[in-house]
Swiss-Prot record:
It comes from Acidiphilium cryptum (strain JF-5). This is Ribosome maturation factor RimM. HAMAP family: Ribosome_mat_RimM. The gene is rimM. The lineage of its organism: Bacteria, Pseudomonadati, Pseudomonadota, Alphaproteobacteria, Acetobacterales. Its main location: cytoplasm. Residues 96-166 form the PRC barrel domain. Binds ribosomal protein uS19. It is found in: Cytoplasm. Gene3D superfamilies: PRC-barrel domain, RimM.
Length: 169
């Protein structure tokens, strides 16, 4: 079972006076976020019910212990609350060439000749295209030209460093 927690969204500022909040999602399917078993940093179950684009009502807790956030003050206390889901609870990718960015973290990065380049430490996406960060601190564009092969079962990714990337020694 894969218990890694994947950040899926963040609760923002309150919306109105009845406990609704703005929610920033990191999911390609923001509506589907409400269907996932979300948890916060403390492990509490967080439920979302969308009321508009990026606006949701929130419940904290499970079963009989679940409490609906019903006023602006309670909603304000949730500002910046991070919403996670266990990797095992995410649906499998639909295509064999698809994967979650989280699955890349920890893969061994090897050159086309098989030489070890380190491991993938992080995947960043700041809006202009994803990039991978290697354990040596290199930040490379996550494109098919730079990462032509990903072997999840084998735990490795082939990385072709672009010519214009300076090498540090």
């Amino acid at each position: 079972m894969d218990d890694r927690l994947i950040l899926m969204g963040v609760i923002g500022r309150p919306h109105g006076v009845r406990g609704a909040v703005h929610v920033t999602t990191y999911s390609p399917d923001p509506e589907g976020l409400a269907e996932l078993p979300l948890r916060d940093e403390r492990g509490r179950r967080v439920g979302l019910a969308w009321t508009g684009a990026g606006i949701a009502r929130v419940t904290i807790g499970e079963g009989d212990e679940a409490a609906a956030i019903a006023d602006r003050d309670a909603a304000a206390k949730l500002t910046n609350l991070r919403l996670y889901v266990r990797r095992a609870d995410l649906p499998p990718p639909e295509d064999e060439d698809e994967f979650y960015f989280a699955d890349l973290i920890g893969l061994h990065a090897v050159g086309p000749d098989g030489a070890a380049l380190g491991t993938i430490r992080a995947v960043h996406d700041f809006g202009a295209g994803a990039s991978i960060e290697l354990s040596d601190g290199s930040l490379l564009p996550f494109t098919r030209a730079v990462v032509p092969e990903i072997d999840l079962p084998g735990g490795r990714a082939v990385v072709v460093r672009p010519v214009e990337v300076e090498m540090r020694e």
